[in-house]
Each structure stands twice: as C-alpha cells, then as structure tokens.
Amino acid sequence: MAFPPLSRVIHPSFTGFTDRDLPCVYVASFDGGIQVPASHLIGGTAQSQWHYDQAVQAIERIRDGYALAIPGIADNLACGLWLDNGVYYFDVSTSFHDVADALDFGRDNNQISVYDSESGGTIAVLK
C-alpha cells in the first residue's frame, strides 16, 4: 500500500480556496507534506492571507483525501506539524507495530527514514 502522489490528493482538498491562499502553502513537498514559511503566520497572517481556520480546513481535507485514496488506512492516519528553521512542516503519516512493515512502507514511498516512537529516533530506509 503506497501513499498516492500528493497532487492527486491536494487539488480537491483546496476546492473553495482562492489563488491567494495557495501561494502561502506553496503547494507541497513530494512526500505528502506541506511547507508554510513561518513569516506567513506572524502578525495575524496579514502577509499571506493564511488564516487559522483555513489551515485547519486544509489539514482536514488533506487527511480526508488520503483516507479516501487508501482503503483501510483512515483509522491509522496521523497529522503532524513542526517548526524548523523558520518553516512550518505539516505531514500525514501512518504507524506500524512492526519495524519491518514500516521500513517496507517507507521504501515503497521513497522515504529517507522512518521515525521510531519507542526510541525517539529515526531508522534509515535502505533502498
């Protein structure tokens, strides 16, 4: 089971958003994540017209798009948001009980590594 290309999920997710909203999301990385420069979220978001409610709607629509695109995965999706070097990253992920399954899934989806929640570290995905 592989995550579909984000372009197949994100486009319907942004129905109803204006062209003004899309540049601040700057659509996405190829691994299923969204990157939003932190400067767009400072000072009431006047710089980008990106508002909290719109961000929540976008996250919910992307999550729901993946849930529809991958049968049986809806109950195992997680959404994460973190700040690194002035950029907020949003990513959809799924979890596994078995490390081998996680590594296989990561390999199938061209991931560099998987996160091990038990150790708090990452494990390289070897090709």
Describe each PLM feature range.
Residues 1-127:
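Conserved, structured core segments of small domains
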